């Protein structure tokens, strides 16, 4: 079977069709091409023409016929669940995690976040006195916090670099 686009997501509504899943690690959700075997043994070739910018999400439907669906299942992985007590802690957390180029995801409650487990981050959270716990959970691309902009491909015809305009109401405040 060939999957060239994401057909929807299981979260959008129920289906009476037989469900089958392709298990993916969170870091493989960015793939746009590959050959996978589903939990029930079906072979699927993934060749996305317009892949989602944030990657494949848990529940994304890649194949559908009259009787069955094949969707993505993001495998739970060890994660650090971090709980901030203030917006200042959120800013510090985002700065430190971003400075280490680690992935950061929204948590299940306000001011909570998830990141893949890494011992150096655990040590950092201890130093910053952030509350955290190590749990297994799904790191779903739909919950990923990203500030990355798409890069221009200089070899691709018609590709142009991003252009930024300064806002008329831009203010820079320097506190001493």
Curated annotation (Swiss-Prot):
SMART domains: UreE_N. It is found in: Cytoplasm. GO terms for biological process: protein folding; protein-containing complex assembly; urea metabolic process. Involved in urease metallocenter assembly. Binds nickel. Probably functions as a nickel donor during metallocenter assembly. GO terms for cellular component: cytoplasm. This is Urease accessory protein UreE. Its main location: cytoplasm. InterPro entries: UreE, UreE_C_dom, UreE_N, UreE_N_sf. It comes from Helicobacter bizzozeronii. Belongs to the UreE family. GO terms for molecular function: nickel cation binding; unfolded protein binding. The gene is ureE. It comes from the Bacteria. Keywords: Chaperone, Cytoplasm, Nickel, Nickel insertion.
């Amino acid at each position: 079977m060939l999957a060239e686009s994401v057909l929807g997501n299981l979260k959008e509504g129920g289906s009476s069709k037989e469900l089958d899943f392709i298990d993916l690690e969170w870091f493989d959700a960015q793939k746009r091409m590959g050959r996978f075997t589903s939990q029930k043994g079906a072979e699927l070739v993934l060749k996305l023409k317009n892949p989602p910018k944030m990657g494949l999400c848990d529940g994304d439907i890649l194949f559908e016929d009259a009787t069955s669906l094949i969707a993505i299942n993001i495998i739970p992985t060890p994660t650090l669940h971090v709980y901030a007590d203030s917006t200042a802690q959120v800013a510090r957390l985002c700065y430190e995690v971003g400075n280490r180029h680690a992935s950061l995801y929204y948590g299940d409650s306000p001011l909570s976040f998830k990141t893949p487990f890494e011992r150096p981050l655990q040590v950092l959270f201890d130093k910053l006195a952030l509350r955290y716990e190590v749990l297994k959970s799904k790191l779903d691309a739909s919950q990923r916090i990203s500030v990355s902009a798409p890069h221009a491909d200089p070899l691709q015809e018609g590709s142009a670099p991003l252009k930024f305009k300064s806002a008329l109401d831009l203010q820079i405040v320097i506190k001493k």
